[in-house]
Amino acid sequence: MRVLKYFRAPSSLRHRSSPMAQFLRRFSSSPMANEDEFQSPVEPSQQQSQDCVSESYLIGFVIANIVGLKYYSGRINGREMVGLVREPLNVYDNNAIRVLNTRSEQVGHIERTVAAVLAPMIDSHTIVVEGIVPNTRSNSNRYRIPCQIHVFAKLEASSTVKSTISRGGLVLISESDTSFGLSEAVVVKEQMGNGDKRSVDKIFKLVDENVKLMGKLVAAEPPREVIKSELFAHQKEGLGWLLHREKSGELPPFWEEKDGEFLNTLTNYRSDKRPDPLRGGVFADDMGLGKTLTLLSLIAFDRYGNASTSTPTEEPLDGEGDKIEKKGKKRGRGKSSESVTRKKLKTDDVVGMNVSQKTTLIVCPPSVISAWITQLEEHTVPGILKVYMYHGGERTDDVNELMKYDIVLTTYGTLAVEESWEDSPVKKMEWLRIILDEAHTIKNANAQQSRVVCKLKASRRWAVTGTPIQNGSFDLYSLMAFLRFEPFSIKSYWQSLIQRPLGQGNKKGLSRLQVLMATISLRRTKEKSLIGLPPKTVETCYVELSPEERQLYDHMEGEAKGVVQNLINNGSLMRNYSTVLSIILRLRQLCDDMSLCPPELRSFTTSTSVEDVTDKPELLQKLVAALQDGEDFDCPICISPPTNIIITRCAHIFCRACILQTLQRSKPLCPLCRGSLTQSDLYNAPPPPPDSSNTDGEDAKSSTKSSKVSALLSLLMASRQENPNTKSVVFSQFRKMLLLLETPLKAAGFTILRLDGAMTVKKRTQVIGEFGNPELTGPVVLLASLKASGTGINLTAASRVYLFDPWWNPAVEEQAMDRIHRIGQKQEVKMIRMIARNSIEERVLELQQKKKNLANEAFKRRQKKDEREVNVEDVVALMSL
């Protein structure tokens, strides 16, 4: 990486308004209930559950009976692993623990007396439990069967767990007992390894090896009746693989036929019924390799004939794109303006297809909808595919209406809203295929949007993402749940078969995951030179703050250090959550422009008590002001961008739906600070500011350019001197900063476009189209929100990228860069990261590197601290304490 020269700014600066909220989920550490993954209120428990799995050790097992067998149809065999799932909303026993077999069929419940002892420790993430039936089920008792429940806990909690089990009247058989070695516990006891460092790509190593053994993937040509564009060779091979996965009748991984039965080799489950084939998988090609066109080609086969192998193809056809049917004039109907002639699909064209099914549901973030529309217009013959936009207040509620279309486009947010709707047509519909675009969006299995997509009905399921792993292997669990790949779709099986062995350095975990991903996934990267992309360079531009900026920054950082150190010393960092997020936020904003942090937002509270907005209206006002300038924050419950924002009296911010579900508990507590919470403690945040895309930034202007703005202008003018027609993208996390940049850049003679999260989908699509229009010449600069532009859109018209402020998750920045460096890019791409010297931004870069190292060592044994989130130690580093 090359380092550019320093820039110095004018010394005369003034201050104006307001910051955005950030950093909302980074301190979530309170223990929450480990509830049913898809049928219970959402809690921020995934991270704690994952940590417990990775760091826990087998301390022994207890013998318990599985009861209620006559009420359930699930079959169970001897020496078979079973899934244990907490069921806190059970109307008969809130300590209930369900027992599931490998095929997700319920067998029964753990007997009440044992569940009463174990459930509280499961809910508090003190223990993780796994079950195994020790011997062949006897016919002498139809109502119960013994089960060994293996108890895992962190070393420091083992004494407490043992005493709790003993006080509950249970007998814990530990490793020191003679009977331990003679029991079935040895089947599941994990042998500790050395915690070898393994890169994320090792998961996909077996995928590459399989491809090499088979030779090149079998290529397929798309139906020319639908697809008018020529596919690259790797896209044709990808299409062939997709078709094979959908038509394959092979046994799923880890299943084999033996003595007339079907055996799962991991769990020892036997059945005389052949397991259903997996029709779908994970399409994990690198960002920018043309996955969307490949998927459209797959959909085209629903309309026209059998897949053909690779043959010389005709020239692309001319024509305009499909019409997109957005929504009906009134709720309940969506009229199509196209009359369509269809060819009937033979039943043998698609194995196992219900001939009444023809519709593919595509779920994506709002910013990606425009990319699908553009790809449809560019690559498909007009009038062939009928597309319905299921988004907005006037979307249809008629299932029969949706069945008329080939493609239904919707967003994760739309589906999350409909989770509780009994009459949701999307939930009623039996889809031919569901495609989750940017599928890493559901990496938190507890999130509302994750639960709802996993419940949808479809014959084929595809998880599509260029970043299948962002934090660690646990990100893949939610994909297994969506794909309904049993037994890995059951969390307890995933933990015992994959997660714990990986975390403890056991080679079995990695080999199982490699076999799994080799079977159901395809991943090709840009480094494999599948397409001739021009080179990309990354540079860092360090900016010196002006004397006035330096004086203010040093003063505020000094005050902030004292506040944070005091909170740490008093153990009250979590109780003053909003203070900490405000401190980090304001220091980062000062690095961009002092006007982002006006005088009224430059004071820090030093209280060590729980913050209460009812007694401090100024605190509520500051939180509201912070929200109004921002979009790059997540609800700490669902780990997703919040909808219908609620501020609690303890100064925490959540989605309305998430926090209202928390209030349904008998003794509701704030998920972050554990303070008591009632409905009267909730405050509605005001709606986001209206889209000001028609303004020129006058309302947000600063009287004098900041150091960073001056540096950016110098870089842009130098680029313009090299090539007057260069198009550039400037990314920032602060919407207010984008507005501030408009006036000086326009004054310098640049044509300005803006793309941020406050815009409607229609407006975003319009801006992206205008930026990519070759007729728009001259020096053009797109001011883009980092998060709103980070996925799914095509900005290949640009060749210069400026990251105006850094973000500690490097994957977010890489996703943004891949909007420019992807298929269709003809020019060399230069990306410049702008960093304020001697500031928190330099420490953010260090944190980025830490997270990159973690991504490259995702399967090493976990340390006691949480390495995937910004924790207390990270705060110490960011504040340079």
From Swiss-Prot:
Chain positions covered by the region annotation Disordered: 308-343, 681-703
Keyword match Oxidoreductase: no
Alphabetic keyword roster: Activator, ATP-binding, Chromatin regulator, Helicase, Hydrolase, Metal-binding, Nucleotide-binding, Nucleus, Transcription, Zinc, Zinc-finger
Gene Ontology biological process terms in this record: chromatin organization
Enzyme Commission number(s) of this protein: 3.6.4.-
GO cellular component: nucleus
Binding site for ATP: D285, D286, M287, G288, L289, G290, K291, T292
Enzyme class: hydrolase
Segments forming RING-type zinc fingers: 635-674
Domain of life: Eukaryota
Pfam families for this protein: Helicase_C, HIRAN, SNF2-rel_dom, zf-C3HC4_3
Record's subcellular location: Nucleus
Domain Helicase ATP-binding span(s) in chain numbering: 272-486
Domain Helicase C-terminal: 711-876
Motif DEAH box in this chain: 437-440
GO molecular function: ATP binding; helicase activity; hydrolase activity, acting on acid anhydrides, in phosphorus-containing anhydrides; nucleic acid binding; zinc ion binding
Main location group: nucleus
Biological role stated in the UniProt entry: Possesses intrinsic ATP-dependent nucleosome-remodeling activity. This activity may be required for transcriptional activation or repression of specific target promoters.
Record family assignment: Belongs to the SNF2/RAD54 helicase family. RAD16 subfamily.
Protein name per its UniProtKB record: Putative SWI/SNF-related matrix-associated actin-dependent regulator of chromatin subfamily A member 3-like 1
